[in-house]
Amino acid sequence: IYAENDRTLRIELDKPTPYLPEMLAHISLVPQYSDPDSPVTNGAYMIESENVKSIHLAKNPYYWQKNNVAFERVEYLPFIATKLSHFDVVVDVPEVHSDLQHFPQLCGYFYEFNLKDPKVAKADVRKAIASLVSVTNIVNNEIPAAIPSSYFLPKAMLNGQDSRWEPVVAEQLLAQNKINERHPLHLNVLYDETPLHVNIAQRLVGQLTQSDMLRVDAQAVSWQTLQAKRQKGDFQVIRSGWCADFNHPMAFLSLFYSKSPDNKNGYANAEYDQLFEQALKSLNEKERSEIYLKLSEKIQQENLALPLFQYTTPVYISSTIMGAKKNSVGVIYSKDLWRKVEN
């Protein structure tokens, strides 16, 4: 990494990294030079002053689109039990308000199968299990602000994926795998013992046990125990979740790549691995997009996980503030905002 001149930074890679632009927005890659007396920034605003209670920003006169930046100054403050109307924008609002919007996060909530466990190793069995679950019912009753989804990837990353409904008769699929009322499938479901996870798990178990072919042993454990069991592969079906570090499908698709340290489900598929590695090497954007679609569809077709919903962030935006648009990463940039003046 080196500066060619005052305005050009050159980054040379040892291999193709198609998601580098998205990765550069991650906090771990921010500039190391951070002298508090003269912080460096190339954004729409510069730090004017900061302390433990507030951060004051001033418009950057060198910003390339400075003429499109409305506010001369922006102040960031901690939100501590005060009226929302005292602010223009409040992120992660703890209360209900008419000016509340929910911005999608790159975070999914799902249950994970241990694909090395013979009871759930067959795709047809997992498909039968998934067909018994109503994600809408669970979400509407437990976390209505979330986005119900039976897809593993966040909604914004599903470009081109077929969303047609596929009729599935769970009992037929289970019977084909020698599972019946006399010889039911015994499932062990692990989840954390905090109230939200308990409530979701109870609804999930209630839906699964509507079939006489399933017997479910549900166990609530501490978060630490849940993580330890996931790490060891000591589970059959386990409550899970994932938040992407950067806005790119590979941040989710890597969970099923056999060589990934984040693969805790035991999935190992030569075709999936080959496609995944091909996407990493390809310099053709269209080809990469087609591969992402194939990988995502493979996850869905084999029911490699049991997705329930995508998280959202509640954001209060004053009715006088314009320019805030919902986006796939749930980010609001001050440079995009402007105030509507009442006549």
Features from the language model and the residues they span:
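Extracytoplasmic/peripheral linker and loop segments enriched in polar/acidic and small residues
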Residues: 1-2, 217-226, 254-319, 343
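Gly/Pro-rich hinge or "lid" segments in bacterial periplasmic/extracellular proteins
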Residues: 6-8, 12-81
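Alpha-to-beta junction loops
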Residues: 7-9, 81-96, 207, 213-215, ...
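Immediate post-signal peptide segment of exported/extracytoplasmic ligand-binding proteins
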Residues: 41, 67-71, 171-188
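Extracellular/periplasmic solute-recognition and catalytic clefts
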Residues: 48-58, 73-117, 139-142
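Ligand/substrate-recognition segments at binding pockets and active sites
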Residues: 52, 177-244, 313
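Periplasmic-binding protein-like
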Residues: 116-158, 162, 200, 299-304
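Long beta-strand-rich cores associated with HINT superfamily self-processing modules
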Residues: 315-343
